[in-house]
């Protein structure tokens, strides 16, 4: 839940106006909006590169998944793996824009481990792929921007472990 929504819900539950502290937090959140949008734009503009390079890193670290019998063996299954990495990158951009992990959780992580397990997909490899995407993506950002985006990648990785 975003800082704005959380503040409003809390104030309303107590039938009161927003406190000066809540208003200051909302002001800070609003002031960081341009930065969060810039980060999301960089990730969006570089999504093909991020996914491609993350896939290359994953397949180097885990050659078993692209070998015969592996979950990403063959052109179609490799494309499916890369599609999933793209999906998680997209979720990260949602979190960055929202300034909160709620959209990541609500849109894309509920039941994901169970789904991968039921399909026989090695969840550890998916987490490793997201780690690789984080490495590539944060390499395109500097300092605080990399830390901001990195925290949402970490959220996805933790959900997969």
From Swiss-Prot:
* Cell compartment(s), UniProt: Plastid, Cyanelle thylakoid membrane
Residues that, per the record, bind (2R,3E)-phycocyanobilin: 81
Alphabetical keyword list: Antenna complex, Bile pigment, Chromophore, Cyanelle, Electron transport, Membrane, Methylation, Photosynthesis, Phycobilisome, Plastid, Thylakoid, Transport
Report the GO terms under cellular component. Answer: cyanelle thylakoid membrane; phycobilisome
User: What does the record say about its membrane topology?
Assistant: Peripheral membrane protein
Question: Where the protein is mainly located, per its record?
Answer: plastid
What GO terms in the biological process aspect are recorded for it?
photosynthesis
Matching CDD domains, A to Z? APC_alpha
Post-translational modification here is noted as: Contains one covalently linked phycocyanobilin chromophore.
Q: Which residues carry this modification: N4-methylasparagine?
A: 71
Quaternary organization: Heterodimer of an alpha and a beta chain.
Similarity comment text for this entry: Belongs to the phycobiliprotein family.
Functional description taken from the UniProt entry? Light-harvesting photosynthetic bile pigment-protein from the phycobiliprotein complex. Allophycocyanin has a maximum absorption at approximately 650 nanometers.
What name does UniProt use for this protein? Allophycocyanin alpha chain
The organism named in the record is: Cyanophora paradoxa
Upper classification of the organism: Eukaryota, Glaucocystophyceae, Cyanophoraceae, Cyanophora
Protein's gene: apcA
